[in-house]
From Swiss-Prot:
Belongs to the UPF0352 family. This is UPF0352 protein Sfri_2492. InterPro entries: UPF0352, YejL_sf.
Amino acid sequence: MAIQSKYTNTQVEALISELLAVLAKHQAPTDLSLMVLGNCVTHLLDKKVPGESRQKVAEQFAKALTQSVK
């Protein structure tokens, strides 16, 4: 069963495009890009996710990321 998102493909693709444009503007190599994006994820988890939920959300994110590259 497909996962339904509350966000449209247009919203998601627009953000992806802008983020990738910033990385390209700075000519960031892949390892730096991954490090920066990982730090952004950590920042969002720390600032936007309640402490009691943080570990579970991080695990779900890691699982989704792992499944997306299979």
